[in-house]
Amino acid sequence: MEARLSETLGLPSPNLNHCHFPNEFNSLFTHFSDLTSVQSPIVRNPKLKTKSSQKPPKFSANFRRSDPPFASTSISDPTHEKPGPEFLKWIKPASRSSPRIQTLIKQLSVWERAIIGAGAGGLAGAFTYVTLLPLDAIKTKLQTKGASQVYSNTFDAIVKTFQAKGILGFYSGVSAVIVGSTFSSAVYFGTCEFGKSLLSKFPDFPTVLIPPTAGAMGNIISSAIMVPKELITQRMQAGASGRSYQVLLKILEKDGILGLYAGYSATLLRNLPAGVLSYSSFEYLKAAVLEKTKQSHLEPLQSVCCGALAGAISASITTPLDVVKTRLMTQIHVEAVDKLGGAMYTGVAGTVKQILTEEGWVGFTRGMGPRVVHSACFSAIGYFAFETARLTILNEYLKRKEESEANVAADS
Protein backbone atom coordinates (compact mmCIF):
# COMPACT_ATOMS: atom_id res chain seq x y z
CA MET A 1 0.00 0.00 0.00
CA GLU A 2 2.73 2.47 1.00
CA ALA A 3 4.95 1.45 -1.93
CA ARG A 4 2.06 1.87 -4.40
CA LEU A 5 1.17 5.30 -2.97
CA SER A 6 4.79 6.43 -3.11
CA GLU A 7 5.05 5.34 -6.74
CA THR A 8 1.88 7.26 -7.63
CA LEU A 9 3.18 10.45 -5.96
CA GLY A 10 6.59 10.14 -7.56
CA LEU A 11 8.36 9.55 -4.25
CA PRO A 12 10.93 6.88 -3.41
CA SER A 13 9.71 3.83 -1.59
CA PRO A 14 9.27 4.49 2.13
CA ASN A 15 12.15 3.65 4.39
CA LEU A 16 11.01 2.02 7.61
CA ASN A 17 14.04 3.40 9.41
CA HIS A 18 12.55 6.90 9.11
CA CYS A 19 9.17 6.02 10.55
CA HIS A 20 9.78 5.56 14.23
CA PHE A 21 7.10 8.09 15.20
CA PRO A 22 7.19 10.12 17.39
CA ASN A 23 10.77 9.69 18.58
CA GLU A 24 12.22 10.30 15.14
CA PHE A 25 9.65 12.80 13.91
CA ASN A 26 12.34 15.40 13.26
CA SER A 27 14.31 13.02 11.05
CA LEU A 28 11.18 11.91 9.20
CA PHE A 29 10.02 15.50 8.70
CA THR A 30 13.44 16.63 7.46
CA HIS A 31 13.73 13.70 5.07
CA PHE A 32 10.24 14.33 3.73
CA SER A 33 10.92 18.07 3.31
CA ASP A 34 14.12 17.35 1.41
CA LEU A 35 12.39 15.05 -1.01
CA THR A 36 9.41 17.30 -1.70
CA SER A 37 11.57 20.41 -2.02
CA VAL A 38 14.42 19.11 -4.16
CA GLN A 39 12.92 16.45 -6.38
CA SER A 40 10.15 16.98 -8.89
CA PRO A 41 7.37 14.40 -9.16
CA ILE A 42 8.32 11.73 -11.64
CA VAL A 43 5.68 10.71 -14.18
CA ARG A 44 6.06 6.97 -14.62
CA ASN A 45 3.90 6.79 -17.75
CA PRO A 46 3.56 10.02 -19.77
CA LYS A 47 0.49 8.71 -21.54
CA LEU A 48 -1.42 8.19 -18.31
CA LYS A 49 -1.57 11.61 -16.68
CA THR A 50 -3.63 11.41 -13.55
CA LYS A 51 -4.54 14.15 -11.09
CA SER A 52 -1.90 12.77 -8.80
CA SER A 53 0.80 13.26 -11.41
CA GLN A 54 -0.35 16.74 -12.40
CA LYS A 55 -0.56 18.29 -8.92
CA PRO A 56 1.88 18.13 -6.04
CA PRO A 57 0.66 16.31 -2.94
CA LYS A 58 -1.26 18.39 -0.41
CA PHE A 59 0.15 18.92 3.02
CA SER A 60 -1.63 19.43 6.27
CA ALA A 61 -1.20 22.70 8.16
CA ASN A 62 1.31 21.04 10.45
CA PHE A 63 3.81 20.43 7.66
CA ARG A 64 5.99 23.23 6.30
CA ARG A 65 8.50 23.44 3.52
CA SER A 66 11.22 24.70 5.81
CA ASP A 67 12.30 24.14 9.36
CA PRO A 68 11.39 26.80 11.92
CA PRO A 69 14.12 29.03 13.34
CA PHE A 70 16.39 27.29 15.83
CA ALA A 71 15.28 23.88 14.52
CA SER A 72 17.56 21.00 15.31
CA THR A 73 17.85 19.84 11.75
CA SER A 74 18.43 21.54 8.43
CA ILE A 75 16.89 20.78 5.09
CA SER A 76 20.17 21.42 3.29
CA ASP A 77 21.27 17.83 3.69
CA PRO A 78 24.43 17.36 1.59
CA THR A 79 23.45 13.78 0.77
CA HIS A 80 20.67 14.98 -1.52
CA GLU A 81 21.20 16.26 -5.03
CA LYS A 82 22.22 19.88 -5.53
CA PRO A 83 19.23 22.22 -5.21
CA GLY A 84 18.15 24.42 -8.07
CA PRO A 85 17.96 28.23 -8.19
CA GLU A 86 14.41 28.40 -6.82
CA PHE A 87 15.46 26.36 -3.82
CA LEU A 88 18.40 28.67 -3.10
CA LYS A 89 16.08 31.67 -2.79
CA TRP A 90 14.62 30.56 0.51
CA ILE A 91 17.26 28.36 2.08
CA LYS A 92 19.81 30.04 4.34
CA PRO A 93 23.28 30.14 2.76
CA ALA A 94 24.85 29.66 6.19
CA SER A 95 23.00 26.46 7.00
CA ARG A 96 24.76 24.85 9.94
CA SER A 97 24.55 21.32 8.45
CA SER A 98 26.53 22.26 5.32
CA PRO A 99 29.94 20.55 5.35
CA ARG A 100 31.57 23.81 4.28
CA ILE A 101 29.92 25.75 7.11
CA GLN A 102 30.91 23.07 9.62
CA THR A 103 34.49 23.43 8.38
CA LEU A 104 34.34 27.21 8.78
CA ILE A 105 32.98 26.84 12.32
CA LYS A 106 35.82 24.49 13.27
CA GLN A 107 38.35 26.89 11.73
CA LEU A 108 37.17 29.86 13.80
CA SER A 109 40.05 31.16 15.88
CA VAL A 110 39.92 31.77 19.62
CA TRP A 111 39.79 35.52 19.00
CA GLU A 112 36.99 35.24 16.44
CA ARG A 113 34.87 33.29 18.92
CA ALA A 114 35.68 35.81 21.64
CA ILE A 115 34.68 38.79 19.47
CA ILE A 116 31.41 37.12 18.44
CA GLY A 117 30.69 36.35 22.10
CA ALA A 118 31.53 39.92 23.13
CA GLY A 119 29.19 41.42 20.53
CA ALA A 120 26.35 39.12 21.52
CA GLY A 121 27.04 39.67 25.22
CA GLY A 122 26.95 43.46 24.92
CA LEU A 123 23.58 43.42 23.18
CA ALA A 124 22.14 40.85 25.57
CA GLY A 125 23.49 42.62 28.66
CA ALA A 126 22.03 46.04 27.86
CA PHE A 127 18.64 44.55 26.97
CA THR A 128 18.48 42.33 30.06
CA TYR A 129 19.68 44.84 32.66
CA VAL A 130 17.28 47.56 31.50
CA THR A 131 14.36 45.11 31.37
CA LEU A 132 14.89 43.94 34.95
CA LEU A 133 16.06 47.20 36.52
CA PRO A 134 12.80 47.68 38.52
CA LEU A 135 13.29 44.33 40.31
CA ASP A 136 16.90 45.22 41.05
CA ALA A 137 15.83 48.60 42.46
CA ILE A 138 13.42 46.97 44.93
CA LYS A 139 16.03 44.39 45.90
CA THR A 140 18.55 47.14 46.62
CA LYS A 141 16.08 49.13 48.75
CA LEU A 142 15.31 46.04 50.84
CA GLN A 143 19.00 45.23 51.37
CA THR A 144 20.07 48.77 52.30
CA LYS A 145 20.96 49.26 55.98
CA GLY A 146 17.89 50.17 58.04
CA ALA A 147 15.49 49.04 55.31
CA SER A 148 13.57 46.88 57.80
CA GLN A 149 12.58 50.09 59.63
CA VAL A 150 11.36 51.76 56.41
CA TYR A 151 9.78 48.90 54.44
CA SER A 152 7.70 46.14 55.99
CA ASN A 153 7.90 43.84 52.94
CA THR A 154 8.52 43.76 49.20
CA PHE A 155 5.08 45.05 48.28
CA ASP A 156 5.46 47.95 50.72
CA ALA A 157 8.77 48.89 49.08
CA ILE A 158 7.11 48.88 45.65
CA VAL A 159 4.22 51.07 46.83
CA LYS A 160 6.43 53.61 48.63
CA THR A 161 8.83 53.84 45.68
CA PHE A 162 5.96 54.54 43.30
CA GLN A 163 4.39 57.09 45.66
CA ALA A 164 7.70 58.93 46.06
CA LYS A 165 8.96 59.10 42.46
CA GLY A 166 6.38 57.43 40.26
CA ILE A 167 7.39 54.94 37.58
CA LEU A 168 10.76 56.67 37.15
CA GLY A 169 11.64 55.64 40.69
CA PHE A 170 12.14 52.09 39.44
CA TYR A 171 14.62 53.26 36.79
CA SER A 172 17.05 55.30 38.88
CA GLY A 173 20.51 55.20 37.29
CA VAL A 174 19.28 53.72 34.00
CA SER A 175 21.93 55.55 31.93
CA ALA A 176 24.72 54.07 34.03
CA VAL A 177 23.08 50.67 33.67
CA ILE A 178 22.99 50.87 29.87
CA VAL A 179 26.60 51.98 29.51
CA GLY A 180 28.02 49.78 32.22
CA SER A 181 26.06 46.63 31.39
CA THR A 182 26.91 46.84 27.68
CA PHE A 183 30.64 46.98 28.32
CA SER A 184 30.70 44.62 31.30
CA SER A 185 28.54 42.00 29.55
CA ALA A 186 30.62 42.26 26.39
CA VAL A 187 33.80 41.74 28.40
CA TYR A 188 32.22 38.95 30.46
CA PHE A 189 30.84 36.85 27.61
CA GLY A 190 33.80 37.63 25.38
CA THR A 191 36.17 36.41 28.08
CA CYS A 192 34.03 33.33 28.74
CA GLU A 193 34.01 32.41 25.04
CA PHE A 194 37.74 33.07 24.88
CA GLY A 195 38.32 30.88 27.92
CA LYS A 196 36.18 28.04 26.60
CA SER A 197 37.87 28.08 23.20
CA LEU A 198 41.36 28.33 24.66
CA LEU A 199 40.90 25.63 27.30
CA SER A 200 39.32 23.29 24.75
CA LYS A 201 42.62 23.26 22.87
CA PHE A 202 44.33 21.56 25.81
CA PRO A 203 43.44 17.84 25.64
CA ASP A 204 44.69 17.21 29.18
CA PHE A 205 42.45 19.87 30.73
CA PRO A 206 39.35 18.22 32.30
CA THR A 207 36.29 18.99 30.18
CA VAL A 208 34.04 19.30 33.22
CA LEU A 209 36.19 22.17 34.54
CA ILE A 210 36.06 24.26 31.36
CA PRO A 211 32.73 26.07 32.12
CA PRO A 212 33.56 27.04 35.73
CA THR A 213 37.08 28.13 34.79
CA ALA A 214 35.82 30.21 31.87
CA GLY A 215 33.10 31.70 34.08
CA ALA A 216 35.66 32.66 36.72
CA MET A 217 37.85 34.34 34.11
CA GLY A 218 34.90 36.32 32.80
CA ASN A 219 33.81 37.47 36.25
CA ILE A 220 37.24 38.61 37.42
CA ILE A 221 37.79 40.77 34.35
CA SER A 222 34.24 42.10 33.91
CA SER A 223 33.91 43.06 37.59
CA ALA A 224 36.42 45.85 37.00
CA ILE A 225 33.78 47.48 34.78
CA MET A 226 30.67 46.27 36.59
CA VAL A 227 31.55 47.57 40.07
CA PRO A 228 31.55 51.32 39.21
CA LYS A 229 28.30 50.85 37.29
CA GLU A 230 26.62 49.06 40.21
CA LEU A 231 28.01 51.58 42.69
CA ILE A 232 26.46 54.56 40.88
CA THR A 233 23.18 52.73 40.27
CA GLN A 234 22.79 51.58 43.86
CA ARG A 235 23.74 54.98 45.30
CA MET A 236 20.90 56.50 43.26
CA GLN A 237 18.51 53.71 44.24
CA ALA A 238 19.41 54.29 47.89
CA GLY A 239 18.49 57.98 47.64
CA ALA A 240 21.40 59.94 46.13
CA SER A 241 20.22 63.05 44.29
CA GLY A 242 21.19 64.08 40.77
CA ARG A 243 21.86 62.28 37.52
CA SER A 244 24.28 59.41 37.01
CA TYR A 245 27.17 61.63 35.89
CA GLN A 246 26.59 63.95 38.88
CA VAL A 247 26.79 61.03 41.30
CA LEU A 248 29.94 59.88 39.49
CA LEU A 249 31.55 63.32 39.88
CA LYS A 250 30.66 63.45 43.59
CA ILE A 251 32.31 60.07 44.17
CA LEU A 252 35.44 61.09 42.26
CA GLU A 253 35.60 64.43 44.10
CA LYS A 254 35.27 62.85 47.53
CA ASP A 255 37.08 59.52 47.24
CA GLY A 256 38.98 59.65 43.96
CA ILE A 257 39.15 56.81 41.44
CA LEU A 258 39.36 54.24 44.23
CA GLY A 259 35.96 55.42 45.44
CA LEU A 260 34.42 53.82 42.37
CA TYR A 261 35.59 50.44 43.65
CA ALA A 262 34.01 50.53 47.09
CA GLY A 263 32.86 47.00 47.74
CA TYR A 264 35.03 45.55 44.94
CA SER A 265 36.27 42.71 47.13
CA ALA A 266 32.72 41.94 48.23
CA THR A 267 31.60 42.08 44.60
CA LEU A 268 34.25 39.55 43.61
CA LEU A 269 33.30 37.46 46.62
CA ARG A 270 29.72 37.41 45.33
CA ASN A 271 30.30 37.41 41.57
CA LEU A 272 32.85 34.62 41.45
CA PRO A 273 30.69 31.91 43.05
CA ALA A 274 27.51 33.36 41.55
CA GLY A 275 29.02 33.63 38.09
CA VAL A 276 30.63 30.21 38.23
CA LEU A 277 27.40 28.63 39.49
CA SER A 278 25.20 30.39 36.94
CA TYR A 279 27.44 29.99 33.90
CA SER A 280 28.42 26.41 34.72
CA SER A 281 24.84 25.39 35.46
CA PHE A 282 23.69 26.83 32.14
CA GLU A 283 26.50 25.17 30.20
CA TYR A 284 25.87 21.79 31.85
CA LEU A 285 22.10 22.06 31.28
CA LYS A 286 22.70 23.18 27.71
CA ALA A 287 25.01 20.23 27.06
CA ALA A 288 22.47 17.81 28.55
CA VAL A 289 19.62 19.18 26.42
CA LEU A 290 21.69 19.12 23.23
CA GLU A 291 22.84 15.59 23.96
CA LYS A 292 19.29 14.39 24.54
CA THR A 293 17.71 16.20 21.59
CA LYS A 294 20.66 15.75 19.19
CA GLN A 295 20.48 19.45 18.30
CA SER A 296 23.32 21.77 17.37
CA HIS A 297 21.98 24.67 19.45
CA LEU A 298 19.20 25.47 21.91
CA GLU A 299 15.75 26.54 20.85
CA PRO A 300 14.40 29.77 22.45
CA LEU A 301 12.23 28.05 25.07
CA GLN A 302 15.07 25.72 26.00
CA SER A 303 17.41 28.70 26.50
CA VAL A 304 14.83 30.40 28.73
CA CYS A 305 14.25 27.32 30.90
CA CYS A 306 17.94 26.47 31.28
CA GLY A 307 18.78 30.08 32.07
CA ALA A 308 15.99 30.49 34.64
CA LEU A 309 16.99 27.33 36.50
CA ALA A 310 20.67 28.27 36.48
CA GLY A 311 19.89 31.77 37.77
CA ALA A 312 17.62 30.56 40.58
CA ILE A 313 20.24 28.08 41.81
CA SER A 314 22.97 30.70 41.79
CA ALA A 315 20.92 33.44 43.47
CA SER A 316 19.57 31.32 46.31
CA ILE A 317 23.07 30.19 47.30
CA THR A 318 24.82 33.56 47.00
CA THR A 319 22.23 35.93 48.56
CA PRO A 320 24.26 36.34 51.81
CA LEU A 321 27.25 37.51 49.78
CA ASP A 322 25.04 39.93 47.87
CA VAL A 323 23.72 41.40 51.14
CA VAL A 324 27.28 42.07 52.34
CA LYS A 325 28.23 43.67 49.02
CA THR A 326 25.10 45.86 48.98
CA ARG A 327 25.67 47.08 52.56
CA LEU A 328 29.25 48.10 51.71
CA MET A 329 28.18 49.92 48.55
CA THR A 330 25.21 51.82 49.98
CA GLN A 331 26.34 52.73 53.51
CA ILE A 332 28.86 55.30 52.28
CA HIS A 333 26.03 57.59 51.17
CA VAL A 334 26.09 60.16 54.00
CA GLU A 335 22.47 61.27 53.64
CA ALA A 336 21.23 57.69 53.99
CA VAL A 337 23.46 57.08 57.03
CA ASP A 338 22.23 60.21 58.79
CA LYS A 339 18.64 59.34 57.96
CA LEU A 340 18.71 55.70 58.97
CA GLY A 341 21.32 55.85 61.72
CA GLY A 342 23.88 53.24 62.67
CA ALA A 343 27.61 52.77 62.44
CA MET A 344 29.58 52.59 59.21
CA TYR A 345 30.63 49.18 57.90
CA THR A 346 34.36 48.47 57.72
CA GLY A 347 35.33 45.77 55.24
CA VAL A 348 33.79 42.40 54.45
CA ALA A 349 34.62 40.76 57.79
CA GLY A 350 33.36 43.75 59.78
CA THR A 351 30.14 43.85 57.77
CA VAL A 352 29.47 40.15 58.36
CA LYS A 353 30.09 40.55 62.09
CA GLN A 354 27.87 43.63 62.37
CA ILE A 355 24.99 42.00 60.48
CA LEU A 356 25.18 38.95 62.75
CA THR A 357 25.22 41.15 65.85
CA GLU A 358 22.36 43.45 64.84
CA GLU A 359 20.09 41.16 62.81
CA GLY A 360 21.25 37.59 63.26
CA TRP A 361 21.36 35.03 60.47
CA VAL A 362 18.08 36.38 59.08
CA GLY A 363 19.95 39.52 58.03
CA PHE A 364 21.78 37.54 55.37
CA THR A 365 18.50 36.56 53.69
CA ARG A 366 17.23 40.11 53.19
CA GLY A 367 15.85 40.51 49.69
CA MET A 368 16.23 36.82 48.85
CA GLY A 369 12.77 36.58 47.27
CA PRO A 370 13.20 39.48 44.83
CA ARG A 371 16.81 38.43 44.21
CA VAL A 372 15.90 34.84 43.24
CA VAL A 373 13.07 36.09 41.02
CA HIS A 374 15.34 38.75 39.56
CA SER A 375 18.19 36.31 38.96
CA ALA A 376 15.94 33.66 37.41
CA CYS A 377 14.36 36.24 35.09
CA PHE A 378 17.72 37.85 34.40
CA SER A 379 19.38 34.56 33.49
CA ALA A 380 16.39 33.38 31.47
CA ILE A 381 16.24 36.59 29.43
CA GLY A 382 20.01 37.05 29.42
CA TYR A 383 20.98 33.61 28.17
CA PHE A 384 18.11 33.61 25.68
CA ALA A 385 19.21 37.01 24.35
CA PHE A 386 22.85 35.93 24.30
CA GLU A 387 22.19 32.65 22.47
CA THR A 388 19.93 34.40 19.97
CA ALA A 389 22.39 37.24 19.35
CA ARG A 390 25.35 34.85 19.17
CA LEU A 391 23.67 32.61 16.60
CA THR A 392 22.58 35.63 14.55
CA ILE A 393 26.05 37.16 14.53
CA LEU A 394 27.69 33.78 13.92
CA ASN A 395 25.42 32.96 10.97
CA GLU A 396 25.95 36.39 9.42
CA TYR A 397 29.71 36.15 9.93
CA LEU A 398 29.87 32.66 8.42
CA LYS A 399 27.71 33.78 5.51
CA ARG A 400 30.02 36.69 4.72
CA LYS A 401 33.10 34.53 5.18
CA GLU A 402 31.68 31.87 2.86
CA GLU A 403 30.81 34.48 0.22
CA SER A 404 34.26 36.05 0.53
CA GLU A 405 36.01 32.72 0.02
CA ALA A 406 33.70 31.91 -2.90
CA ASN A 407 34.57 35.24 -4.55
CA VAL A 408 38.29 34.63 -4.06
CA ALA A 409 37.95 31.16 -5.56
CA ALA A 410 35.97 32.55 -8.51
CA ASP A 411 38.57 35.26 -9.20
CA SER A 412 41.38 32.74 -9.16
Swiss-Prot record:
InterPro entries found in the cross-reference section: Mitochondrial_sb/sol_carrier, Mt_carrier_dom_sf
Key word Disulfide bond present: no
GO annotations of cellular component type: chloroplast; chloroplast envelope; chloroplast inner membrane; plastid
Tissue: Expressed in leaves, developing flowers and siliques.
Keyword Cytoplasm applies: no
Biological process (GO), any one: iron ion transport
Disrupted gene: phenotype observed: Reduced vegetative growth and reduced expression of ferritin.
Placement of Solcar repeats on the sequence: 112-198, 206-288, 298-392
Compartment list: Plastid, Chloroplast inner membrane
Membrane topology, from the record: Multi-pass membrane protein
Induction: Up-regulated by iron excess.
Xref: PROSITE patterns: SOLCAR (PS50920)
PANTHER family, sorted: S-ADENOSYLMETHIONINE MITOCHONDRIAL CARRIER PROTEIN
Similarity section: Belongs to the mitochondrial carrier (TC 2.A.29) family.
The name this protein goes by in its record: Protein MITOFERRINLIKE 1, chloroplastic
Phylogenetic lineage: Eukaryota, Viridiplantae, Streptophyta, Embryophyta, Tracheophyta
